[in-house]
Amino acid sequence: MKKYTYLIFCLLFVALVIAIPELHPQTCHLDGDTLTMLAAGPAFAPLKWNVGQNNMGGYKGRLLFVPFDAPNTVPTVPDPGKAADNEALVTAAGTFAFPAEGTYKQPIYLYSTDATVDYKAEQQGEADGISYKQTLSFFFPGNTPEMHAFNALVKNTAGYYVFEDSDRRQMIMGQPGLYASTAPSFNGGKARSDRRGTTYTATADSNYSAIFLETPIDMEVIGGLKPAPTPPIE
């Protein structure tokens, strides 16, 4: 009986030795796309950079602000476990929609002096609890009653900001329950050559260093800089 068991063991060992070299080349010949398809949902992927591609910094001098209680739907990022891929993980799907009976029918357009819009996301927290402090700042010139009224209202109103980088990618700051809070700071200047106006600094806590909008918003239409497109005739 022992000899019979020993013989079976030897045969299995020989079969295994023969099979391993056959399987190894099959695995090595899988290309990157195929290997990526084997993983479901977000996973670490190479960060590549094409030499010579544009990388101009800065943001456009226009933004949108939405008070947190104004819309009934908001662009949101998916649950991390349900994101289809890495790009979807940091992409807010959906649009702002406002109730018919509400005060606001669309986002509030904000002008900012050229080259004054700034955004950064700094790491915060301790090990096993790292997140980001998103900070958005911009400058509105002047000393008008309308501006000071906006300052009075926005200082204690949480909400969402939409802004656009130099590559025309729109980003959103604030998510349901993790709204952006705004601190306005007015400076009237001292000398005649000084520029007067309000600097706005908005901050929000987030698990992401940036969130992009899946559906861009036409800021020029909202700002009244161009007419809204005519609906197609059915």
Map each language-model feature to its residues.
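Short, intrinsically disordered N-terminal pre-domain segments
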Residues: 1-77, 217, 225-234
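Solvent-exposed edge beta-strands and adjacent loop segments
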Residues: 44-133, 178-193
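Aromatic-patch recognition
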Residues: 118, 146, 163, 173-174
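Short, conserved charged micro-motifs
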Residues: 145-152, 211-214
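Residue-level signal for secondary-structure boundary sites
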Residues: 146, 169-171, 208-210
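Short, acidic/charged, Gly/Pro-enriched secondary-structure junctions
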Residues: 151-173
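Mixed-charge, glycine-accented linear interaction segment located at domain edges/termini
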Residues: 178-234
